[in-house]
C-alpha cells in the first residue's frame, strides 16, 4: 500500500482531500516516488509470473508474423526515391534514398546506389529510448534536418546532416518541438520551441553555419489557448505559420524565396472558425468551417489577397459528409472525406482556371474498411498514392491513376505464417445510445466464432479530440482472435467518426455522452448474445484511459477485465492547474473549471480518481511513462494507489511504469511487441481463456502499420494515443 498524506484543495467552495498528492513531486526523480513506482513494477512482474511462458509464446507469435527485414514502398520526390528499411534484430528503421533514373518512374528494387540518410539504430546507440521528430531535406536535397528525443519527453535536439558526406554539421539546436520548414535558399531553416508548459509557442529562424545563439525569433504566440506550427505548401512556394486552438485557427504565409521577409496573415482568427490551406497556381484552396459549415467546406482565394472577403465556394458544405482535408496536384484535387463513419477519397478533375471537372470516389473492396492518403510530394503527377486497410485486410499501398482510374497494388503488409483472411470476418453492428443516437461498432472475429455468451470480447474506445478509431488491421491481434476473442471498436461521441457534431456532442458539458455511448455498446454486445459481463474486457489509452476509468466507476459489474494505458484519470487536478503542460489548451475540450463552478462540478462528477468507491472492480492493468509530458506518471500512479486502498475485491490491480520512456511507450519495436504480449497475457488470464490458440485457425499468422517514411505527419494532440 502506498503511503497516505492527506492534502486539501478548495475550489468553488468545495474541498477535496487527496491522500496521494505527494506523488506529484516537483522532480520525477524524487527517491520516494521512484521507489513506489519500482515497487509497483515489481508487484506487476510477480503477479504476472504465472503468465511468463504465455508472454513468451505471444511475443513469439507476434514477431513470427512479421517480415523483420523489410522495405517500405519508396516515395519519389524530385531526383530521389526515399524509403525506410528494417533489419531482423534491429529495433529501429534505417532511412535511405536512391537517385531516380531520368524517365524511369519505377521504384528501385535493390540496394545498388543506396544512400543511408539516417540509421536510427546507430544514432540510438545504448539509449533506452530513441525517437526521431523532424526529418526534412532542403529543397535541393543536399542537407537533412533531423531531430531526436532520448527521454520520451518530446523535447528534441535538432541536427543537420550533409547527405554527401553523411556527417552532421556543427549546427545543433536543443529544446525544439515538432514542425520545421526550409526556405528556398537551402540555407534558412524554421523551427518551433515550446514553453515551460510544453506549448509550442515560438517560431525561430536559423541559418546554416551559424550558432543557435544567433537564431532569430520570428513570432511568439501569446495566447495560451493556441499552439504554433510551421510547414510549407506542397509546391514549396510558401512557408505556412499556423496557430490553432481546439476550435479556432489562423494562418500566415511567406514566400519561400524570401525567407527573411515578413509573414502575412491569410485571415485573422475568429472564435470558432477553423481553416487550413494549400497553394495551387497562384490560388489558395482553403478547408474551413466558416459560415456555419459544420462539416467543413472548400473555398479558394487569390494568393495575393487570400482574406475571407475573397473566398469563393469550391465544394459546398454537405451535412452527410465531413471534409477532413485535401491534397493538390497540377490537374487534380483530392478530397479526404468521412461518410457514414468511414474514410473515403474523392478525386476531382481540376482545370487550368481552377474550374472543377468530373469527380468520383475511389472504390474500395469491402464494406467496412478505411482509405487514407499516402505520401504524395510530387505536384506534377496524375498518380495518387493512398493506403487501405480493414480489420481483415493488411495495410495496403496503392498507386491510383486519377485519369484512367486504374489502381496498382504496390505492397500489402506481409503477414507470415500462412495468414488467410477468409478465416476471419469483419462486420458492423449498430448500438442504440441512451438518447437514440446510433453508434456503429466495428467487429472482427474468427469465421467459426459464432455468437456465444461465453465468448471473450475486447471492446476498445477513445472518444476525445475528434480523433477517429478506424477499422484497420493488426497482425498482433490475431493472437487474440485465434484464441476465440472477438475484437470490437466503439466509435463513441467525442470522437470524429460520424462528423463534427459527433465530436461536439461528446465534449465540454456533454462529455458524459462518451461514457454512456461506450456502456451502450457494451450492453448491446451482451444483449445480442455476443458475450457476458464476466467475459467482456475493455481497453483504452490516454483520453481513452479516462473512458475506461470513468465507466469502471459507473458500471464496474459490466466488465470482466480492463486495460488503461497512460490514462488521463486525475482530470480535475490536471485541468485546474494552468501551469501543467497543455492545460490551458485543453479548456476548450473539457471546459474551464477554474472560472466555471458548473464545469467544475460536472468534471468532478466523472473524474475517475475522485469517484473511486468501496466496491468490487474487475482485474485492471494500468501503464504509465515516467517522462510522459502529456499524462504525467502521477495520474495513473495516484489512481492505482487509491483503487488499491479502497476497492473491496482481491482481483489483480497492476501498474507498469516505463522508467525510461514517455507517452508513446517504449520506442523500439521489439520492446513494443513485448508490451503487447503482456497486455494480451493479462487479458487471457483475467478472462480465463485458453492460453493455446485453436489449431482450427490454421498456421499462426508486421505488427501495426508499416514503418512510416520520411514524410510522415506530426503526432496527434495532447492526450491522444
Residue ranges and their predicted role:
Residues 81, 144-146, 189, 239, ...:
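Hydrophobic beta-strand positions that form the internal "hydrophobic ladder"
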Amino acid at each position: 500500500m502506498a503511503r497516505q498524506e492527506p492534502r486539501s484543495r478548495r475550489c468553488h467552495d468545495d474541498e477535496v482531500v487527496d491522500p496521494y498528492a505527494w506523488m506529484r513531486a516537483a522532480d520525477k526523480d524524487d527517491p520516494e516516488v521512484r521507489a513506489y513506482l519500482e515497487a509497483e513494477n515489481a508487484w506487476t512482474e510477480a503477479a504476472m509470473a504465472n503468465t511468463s511462458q504465455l508472454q513468451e509464446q505471444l511475443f513469439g507469435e507476434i514477431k513470427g508474423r512479421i517480415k523483420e527485414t523489410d522495405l517500405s514502398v519508396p516515395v519519389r520526390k524530385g531526383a530521389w526515391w526515399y524509403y525506410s528499411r528494417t533489419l531482423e534484430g534491429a529495433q529501429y528503421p534505417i532511412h535511405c534514398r536512391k537517385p531516380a533514373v531520368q524517365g524511369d518512374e519505377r521504384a528501385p528494387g535493390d540496394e545498388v546506389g543506396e544512400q543511408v540518410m539516417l540509421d536510427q539504430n546507430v544514432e540510438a546507440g545504448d539509449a533506452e529510448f530513441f525517437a526521431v521528430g523532424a526529418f526534412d531535406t532542403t529543397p535541393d536535397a543536399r542537407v537533412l534536418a533531423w531531430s531526436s528525443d532520448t527521454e520520451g519527453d518530446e523535447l528534441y535536439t535538432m541536427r543537420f546532416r550533409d547527405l554527401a558526406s553523411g556527417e552532421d554539421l556543427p549546427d545543433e539546436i536543443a529544446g525544439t518541438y515538432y514542425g520545421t520548414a526550409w526556405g528556398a535558399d537551402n540555407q534558412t531553416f524554421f523551427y518551433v520551441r515550446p514553453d515551460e508548459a510544453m506549448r509550442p509557442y515560438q517560431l525561430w529562424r536559423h541559418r546554416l553555419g551559424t550558432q543557435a545563439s544567433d537564431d532569430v525569433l520570428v513570432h511568439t504566440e501569446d495566447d495560451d489557448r493556441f499552439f504554433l506550427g510551421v510547414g510549407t505548401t506542397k509546391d514549396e512556394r510558401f512557408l505556412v505559420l499556423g496557430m490553432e486552438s481546439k476550435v479556432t485557427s489562423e494562418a500566415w504565409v511567406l514566400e519561400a524565396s524570401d525567407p527573411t521577409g515578413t509573414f502575412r496573415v491569410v485571415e485573422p482568427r475568429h472564435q470558432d472558425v477553423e481553416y487550413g490551406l494549400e497553394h495551387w497556381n497562384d490560388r489558395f484552396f482553403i478547408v474551413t468551417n466558416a459560415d456555419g459549415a459544420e462539416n467543413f467546406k472548400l473555398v479558394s482565394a487569390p494568393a495575393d489577397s487570400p482574406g475571407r472577403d475573397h473566398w469563393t465556394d469550391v465544394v459546398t458544405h454537405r451535412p452527410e459528409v465531413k471534409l477532413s482535408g485535401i491534397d493538390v496536384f497540377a490537374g487534380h484535387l483530392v478530397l479526404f472525406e468521412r461518410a457514414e463513419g468511414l474514410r473515403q477519397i474523392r478525386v476531382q478533375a481540376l482545370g487550368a482556371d481552377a474550374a472543377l471537372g468530373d469527380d468520383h470516389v475511389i472504390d474500395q473492396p469491402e464494406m467496412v474498411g478505411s482509405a487514407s492518403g499516402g505520401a504524395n510530394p510530387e505536384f506534377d503527377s496524375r498518380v495518387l498514392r493512398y493506403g487501405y486497410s480493414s480489420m481483415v485486410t493488411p495495410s495496403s499501398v496503392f498507386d491510383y491513376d486519377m485519369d484512367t482510374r486504374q489502381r496498382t497494388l504496390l505492397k500489402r503488409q506481409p503477414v507470415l505464417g500462412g495468414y488467410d483472411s477468409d478465416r476471419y470476418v469483419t462486420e458492423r453492428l449498430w448500438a442504440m445510445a441512451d438518447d437514440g443516437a446510433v453508434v456503429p461498432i466495428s467487429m472482427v472475429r474468427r469465421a467459426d466464432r459464432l455468437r456465444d455468451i461465453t465468448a471473450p470480447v475486447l471492446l476498445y474506445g477513445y472518444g476525445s479530440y475528434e480523433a477517429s478509431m478506424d477499422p484497420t488491421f493488426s497482425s498482433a491481434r490475431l493472437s487474440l482472435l485465434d484464441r476465440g476473442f472477438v475484437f470490437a471498436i466503439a466509435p463513441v461521441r467525442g470522437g470524429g467518426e460520424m462528423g463534427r457534431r459527433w465530436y461536439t456532442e461528446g465534449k465540454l458539458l456533454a462529455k458524459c455522452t462518451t461514457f454512456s455511448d461506450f456502456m451502450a455498446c457494451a450492453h448491446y454486445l451482451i444483449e445480442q448474445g455476443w458475450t457476458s459481463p464476466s467475459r467482456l474486457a475493455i481497453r483504452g489509452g490516454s483520453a481513452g484511459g479516462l473512458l475506461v476509468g470513468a465507466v469502471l466507476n459507473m458500471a464496474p459489474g459490466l466488465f470482466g477485465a480492463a486495460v488503461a494505458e497512460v490514462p488521463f484519470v486525475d482530470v480535475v487536478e490536471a485541468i485546474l492547474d494552468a501551469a501543467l503542460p497543455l492545460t490551458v489548451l485543453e479548456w476548450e475540450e473539457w471546459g474551464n473549471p477554474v472560472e466555471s463552478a458548473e464545469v467544475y462540478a460536472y468534471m468532478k462528477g466523472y473524474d475517475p480518481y475522485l469517484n473511486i468507491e468501496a466496491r468490487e472492480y474487475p482485474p485492471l492493468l494500468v501503464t504509465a511513462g515516467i517522462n510522459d509530458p502529456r499524462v504525467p506518471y502521477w495520474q495513473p500512479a495516484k489512481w492505482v494507489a487509491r483503487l488499491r486502498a479502497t476497492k473491496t475485491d482481491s482481483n489483480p490491480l497492476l501498474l507498469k511504469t516505463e522508467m525510461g520512456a514517455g507517452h508513446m511507450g517504449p520506442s523500439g519495436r521489439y520492446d513494443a511487441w513485448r508490451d503487447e504480449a503482456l497486455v494480451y497475457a493479462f487479458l487471457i488470464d483475467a478472462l480465463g481463456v485458453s492460453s493455446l490458440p485453436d489449431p482450427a485457425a490454421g498456421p499462426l499468422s508486421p505488427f501495426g502499420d508499416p514503418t512510416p517514411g520520411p514524410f510522415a505527419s506530426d503526432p496527434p494532440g495532447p492526450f491522444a494515443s
